[in-house]
């Protein structure tokens, strides 16, 4: 991982990690009520950002892999939120859907940039990502 990519990934991990941790400590416990394991899951997801930030700052491969995994999970959740809003759901419960749409779109963009800067978009193919996929099928 190059120095500029590590710097960009560290900055994006700090931004998204701060937002996820703030949501986990402030918003999720009040929103989920009795479903406290969901709030704990959001808090752990926020803390995982800072663990990946530590790994990337040290230049280790596990930090890059954790940052890629966080980008995939966060991007998937953000895309699911945009899809829910497109289907007329109001996941934030407020009168204005535009604020929620902007927040979810911003989060999706941040996780997309995090995935790119952490090195997921390398076009190495399916074989490198998955060890169980048979090699001869990839040469069709």
List where the protein language model places each region.
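Topology signature of small-to-medium multi-pass alpha-helical membrane proteins
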Residues: 1-140
């Amino acid at each position: 991982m190059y120095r500029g990519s590590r710097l960009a990934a560290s900055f994006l991990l700090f931004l998204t990690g701060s937002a996820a941790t703030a949501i986990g400590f402030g918003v999720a416990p009040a929103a989920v009520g009795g479903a406290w394991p969901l709030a704990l899951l959001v808090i752990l997801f926020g803390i995982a950002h800072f663990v990946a930030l530590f790994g990337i700052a040290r230049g280790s491969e596990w930090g890059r892999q954790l940052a890629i995994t966080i980008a995939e999970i966060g991007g998937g959740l953000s895309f699911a939120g945009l899809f829910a809003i497109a289907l007329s759901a109001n996941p934030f419960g407020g009168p204005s859907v535009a604020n929620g749409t902007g927040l979810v779109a911003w989060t999706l963009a941040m996780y997309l940039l995090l995935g790119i800067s952490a090195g997921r978009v390398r076009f190495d193919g399916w074989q490198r990502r998955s060890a169980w996929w048979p090699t001869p099928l990839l040469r069709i």
